[in-house]
Amino acid sequence: TPLYSSAASDVYKRQVNYCTKENIPIFPGAYTPLEIYNANKLGATAVKIFPATQLGPGYVKDVLAPLPNLKLLPTGGVSVDNIASFFKVGAIGVGMGSSLFDKALIANNDYDGLFQHFKKIAKEVFNAKQ
C-alpha cells in the first residue's frame, strides 16, 4: 500500500513516526518517486517498492540517480533469475515471497533441493554485491 494513499496518509505517518521514535525498523511501501522520497523523509528504515518486476531494475537506478542515499527494497516478483539485477543498481535488499520457497520442493519434502535453492539465491546476491 502506498505511503500516501488518501485514506491512510495520517495512519502511515503516525506508524513511521512511532517506529522511528521507538527505534523500530519500518519499511513502508511506495510506488512513485514522491512516495519514496516522502517515506524516506519521515524516517523509514528503508522503502519497499512494489511491484518490482513491473517497475524493474531501471526504475531503481533512475530513482537512486538523484537520491543516492535512499534505501530501497524492491518487492514483488523478485526471483533467483532477477535478484542480482536489483542489487547491481543499488537496492540494499529485496523482498521475496513465493519465489523464495519453491512449492514443488516443499511438496516433495525435498529439503536438500530447497537448501540448494537457498544457496543459489545467496550466491546470486553475494556475486551481485562484489
Sequence positions of predicted segments:
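Single conserved hydrophobic/aromatic residue that forms the stacking wall/gate
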Residues: 1-8, 12
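Glycine-rich beta-to-alpha transition loops that act as phosphate-gripper elements at the mouths
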Residues: 9-10, 28-33, 52-54, 73-80
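Short beta-strand/loop segments at the ligand-binding rim of alpha/beta enzyme cores
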Residues: 18-27, 66-73
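C-terminal helical cap(s) of enzyme catalytic domains, especially alpha/beta-barrels
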Residues: 20-21, 87, 104-130
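Glycine/Thr-rich beta-alpha phosphate-binding loop at enzyme active sites
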Residues: 20-25, 32-59, 103-110
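Catalytic cores of alpha/beta
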Residues: 34-42, 79-94
